[in-house]
Amino acid sequence: MKKYLYLVLGFQACVVFGSTKALKTTAELTHWKQTGRYVEVERLCKAFTKKFPQNVDCISFGKTPEGRQMRALVVADSKKGLLSFYAKKKKRPVVFVQGGIHAGEIDGKDAGFWLIREILENEANPKTVKALKEVTLVFVPVFNVDGHERFGKHNRPNQVGPEEMGWRTTAQNYNLNRDYMKVDSPEMKAMIQLLNQWDPLIALDLHVTDGAKFQHDVSIIMEPLFYGLKETREMALEIKEMVLNGLKTEGHLPLGFYPSFLKEDEPSSGFDLGVAPPRYSQGYLGVRNRVGMLVETHSWKDYATRVKAARNVVENTLLIIAEKGKQWRKQIEILDGQVSSQVGQEMGLAFKNSEKKKEEISFLGYHYQIEDSAVSGTTKITYFSNQPEVWKVPLYTEVIPEISERIPEGYIVPKSFQSIVIPKLQAHGIQFREIEDQVGIKEVEIFRADSFKFAEKSFEGHQGLKVTGEWKKEKVTINPGDLFVSTRQPKAFLIFHLFEPKGPDSLLAWGFFNSRFEQKEYMENYVTESVAKEMLTNPEIKKVFEEKLKQSEFEESPEKRLEFFYRLHPSWDQTLGLYPVYRVQEKLK
């Protein structure tokens, strides 16, 4: 009997050990020396669901260009909590965590699996285990799946471990953390759809930073802090401070700003606070009136240290949302109503730091030396990581709008450009409608660029465009079938950023309307000479021309001189530089 009992207990121990091992990552099993391939994500996703069917759902939310499934784990305390419609109905807060948007920066994948396993096997802090009673966790281990499988030892030369890792960009060479607004990649289309489905209160994007060598192991950067509704900003700030305090208690050396020197390789130049444009994950969440958190573990820490830091950021966030998330979730719905009624309010589109306000901070760095370089022909910096130092450096804390506009009633898109605009609106889950009745001639605002400049080189598959100018009132014909996008909806801030032409992440800035800024008809020089001779008989034109000749750039350019007269001729294309979107300040019937 005793022998039989030993056999049973031994079998149970093997089952428990085997089960636990089956849920561990390659990173855990190799003591944080290696990270697994994507097949491990597939296996673990299904293994967690099999062992904890009431608590985990392994979902596929898209397919990559190379044909791989994009996986997410939904984790909650009950089967109902795994359903997005239930979470919305019960106002259950959702915490969204993604790893591997840059697949070489893969800490988030292993951190998330580690924390989920410990929670479900009751190895985590009891408060963290209980957090799932109040919160649904949606975890995407690897966003950039194809990039993850471009595995290699030399993909991250500025990073310590793991032994091999994935690549920064996708198989189509998109940097996904520049794609949130333009939604070019199949991966981003799938991700935005997932965000629309779950509507998380907060989303964490887990990265590894490059940059200088210093002692701090993790940074968190939040949005929105300097724009949007006051209550949402306060929510983001409170979460930030609570997470930082939690990390300090656990022995981490966290930062609440992005640790990039104002001048490259010059530690004494210090740091500043900033605002992430909505092309970035945290900025995108911010303009959706949600909280976005960028997590940057420090690349020069070993992999074990970095993964632990990422894990603890997620854990602290879960604890905070478990405590306050239900109240915040109810509040955010009320705030969405306020976002829908911001017509006429001024809002920043781009921001910069003022030099007026700064504070001296104690930054934990290392001794360094700057000297001339025979290689680059300039200076180089050398860090001595065995000689820790405390740097006294400035942190510039005042952030001010650089470009601002007032939120209008809405935007009208003529039929001719809807094939460009509609897919973007649908991707973001923005409401719009076709104008059915004959509106006829109506006074709207149009934007005709005073000047415009194309980017000198391609960026993320686009030739960017910068414009100057102002909206001006003009009467135009509004036709049935034209598109109306009202800002009286919860995604008003997102709409505002998409359509305001001077915004850094507007559809115009990304080059979607470049054809409207390309000259397609011309006047021969000899014809222009004849036209100019006649025009110069007009004293007013002659006076303006002679004034412009005092500008050396104009005086020395035959092209600019001839164009001056061509622009005054009736044959000049009046649609050149005309933004093909109208702005309205009154409700459309």
Language-model-derived ranges and their functions:
Residues 4-6, 17-589:
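Structured catalytic-domain cores with a bias toward divalent-metal coordination
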